[in-house]
């Protein structure tokens, strides 16, 4: 019976690690493509794209840092308490960087439709950089809070003398912190605020489009574009909520000493990380300029491959 449990655990770990690696690769490639698209297409270099790039950087960090660390933590390697805690905090930083970038995007789109006349004077480039810097600062402070004392060090000290342990997220991070501070304060509340902002955006746009704007074709076109952009960005927000809420609910339920199956926990973690590879797909499907530039890049890559193939064939023929 014990051997069966060990085999089952091994298969779960192998499946989890394989899927994490695939998600990480897709997240890095997809979001690097987003940044490449912005670099190649000057028409995409709008103020909103600064925030989209910030979100892409957070998602790249998930693929490069968070997923490898999550795999290391899942293997329960023996290490010092604070080394394990720091690794766990890094996982949290980029979660909050994503949510703060989404909040920044929502606020920016709201200002765009609400302050149409004063928009350019209010949203200067300097203010946008300051806002982005504030978002990342908050993300680091919230994510690193357990390092300043809100952790399970005292609980573990009373039950074991050694400062080393088998590293596991829940062994070092307090569920009080996860549920009340990380989830409710810095994930759930921003999600509710963003939903209210987007509802107001759609309400403003609908009112403007329903008004008799005959002779104001440019104004109608502006609000039509804003409506399409808002729908696309709201889909990004919806996917974030869909991917992160299951894991947050699992943590919330665990707070009341309910036993969660390992499979459910792994699925929750995988789903949360999978969100990092979804945004490039949304941009490709929903934002025309992104889609067009994606196709240009793919065409250029195919032409390069064809050219390389022709060169190698020519060399073989010459020989």
From Swiss-Prot:
Glycans are attached at residues 5, 13, 161. Gene3D superfamilies: Rhodopsin 7-helix transmembrane proteins (1.20.1070.10). GO terms for cellular component: neuromuscular junction; plasma membrane; synapse. One of its GO terms (biological process) is histamine secretion by mast cell. It is a multi-pass membrane protein. The keyword Cell membrane applies. Residues 39-49, 108-127, 200-232, 286-319 are cytoplasmic. Residues 1-15, 74-85, 150-178, 257-262 are extracellular. Pfam families: 7tm_1. Phosphorylation on Thr-317 and Thr-318 may be crucial for rapid desensitization. Phosphorylation on Thr-317 may be necessary for phosphorylation on Thr-318 to occur. InterPro entries: Adeno_A3_rcpt, Adenosn_rcpt, GPCR_Rhodpsn, GPCR_Rhodpsn_7TM. Disulfide bonds join 84-167. A lipid is attached at residue 304 (S-palmitoyl cysteine). Keywords: Cell membrane, Disulfide bond, G-protein coupled receptor, Glycoprotein, Lipoprotein, Membrane, Palmitate, Phosphoprotein, Receptor, Transducer, Transmembrane, Transmembrane helix. CDD domains: 7tmA_Adenosine_R_A3 (cd15070). It is found in: Cell membrane. The chain crosses the membrane at residues 16-38, 50-73, 86-107, 128-149, 179-199, 233-256, 263-285. GO terms for molecular function: G protein-coupled adenosine receptor activity. It comes from the Eukaryota. Belongs to the G-protein coupled receptor 1 family. PANTHER family: ADENOSINE RECEPTOR A3, OLFACTORY RECEPTOR AND ADENOSINE RECEPTOR. Receptor for adenosine. The activity of this receptor is mediated by G proteins which inhibits adenylyl cyclase. This is Adenosine receptor A3. It comes from Mus musculus. The gene is Adora3.
